Amino acid sequence: MSPMARKPLIAGNWKMNLDHQQAIGTVQKLAFALHKDYYEKVDVAVIVPFTDLRSVQTLVEGDKLQITYGAQDVSQHESGAYTGEVSASMLAKLNCSWVVVGHSERREYHNETDELVAAKAKAALSKGISPIVCVGEPLEIREAGTHVDYVVEQTRASLAGLSADELANTVIAYEPVWAIGTGKVASAADAQEVCKAIRGLVTELAGEEVAEGMRILYGGSVKAETIAEIVSQPDVDGGLVGGASLDGEAFAKLAANAANAV
């Protein structure tokens, strides 16, 4: 598969924002503002709080929207006495296409390890949901100049135990921790450097065909003004967007800018 065949994914991670009523309005605005022709060039997803999923599902399916949706976390367990956890089978019942695993905020605030992230990714894949596996270096690693090796090894550990077929249904998001919510943005060249190295790792793990088909996103203060240069990089296949996805019309503009750049 040539790199040109990878359709960019623009995924909006709402984090802990927007209740289920606000979610309906936001997705309606996004759908209204983004002309249907753009979906031929980019896939657009919203990654929403658990409490919003059923409302978003009802809207997307009822209005036959081309937007896809997913969750921000999943349990590694199938079911049982795990208070507060949500299983992959529950998300599958809601027709989730995606689930983010290993976001830097989960790694930092909930002490999630690479091993746990890999288990969550495998749980999602077992129910037909594509995990968006997040990796990225803190500022001190970037300043030391060891960021490429750090991220490659973090990615290797976060994909441990996944087969080539499973990796073919996995998305990776490179999100330098120092650029998340800080307004600092890695340059497009920075993003390309690391995403290319991640693709090299996937070639090693699963072969060239899987690696060439895998979508690798950049996340970290992505905005409408910066997305075009980011997705123009040969190994960057979209964006994991934070704050810029909370306004439906603004997120539509960002997605349109990405579509126009490919």
Swiss-Prot record:
Any one biological process term the GO annotation gives: gluconeogenesis
Catalysed reaction, written as an equation: D-glyceraldehyde 3-phosphate = dihydroxyacetone phosphate
Quaternary structure and partners: Homodimer.
Name this polypeptide is given: Triosephosphate isomerase
Matching Pfam families: TIM
Residue numbers binding substrate: 13-15, 181, 221, 242-243
Gene Ontology cellular component terms for the protein in this record: cytosol
PANTHER family: TRIOSEPHOSPHATE ISOMERASE
Domain of life: Bacteria
Lineage of producing organism: Bacteria, Bacillati, Actinomycetota, Actinomycetes, Mycobacteriales
Claim: Cytoplasm is one of the keywords in the record: yes
Record organism: Corynebacterium efficiens (strain DSM 44549 / YS-314 / AJ 12310 / JCM 11189 / NBRC 100395)
GO molecular function (one): triose-phosphate isomerase activity
Primary location group: cytoplasm
Catalytic residue list: 103 (electrophile), 175 (proton acceptor)
Annotated compartments: Cytoplasm
Pathways per UniProt: Carbohydrate biosynthesis; gluconeogenesis; Carbohydrate degradation; glycolysis; D-glyceraldehyde 3-phosphate from glycerone phosphate: step 1/1
EC number: 5.3.1.1
Main function: Involved in the gluconeogenesis. Catalyzes stereospecifically the conversion of dihydroxyacetone phosphate (DHAP) to D-glyceraldehyde-3-phosphate (G3P).
Keywords from the named record: Cytoplasm, Gluconeogenesis, Glycolysis, Isomerase
Family to which the UniProt record says this protein belongs: Belongs to the triosephosphate isomerase family.
SUPFAM superfamilies: Triosephosphate isomerase (TIM)
Gene (name only): tpiA
Entries under CDD domains matching the protein: TIM (cd00311)
PROSITE patterns: TIM_1, TIM_2
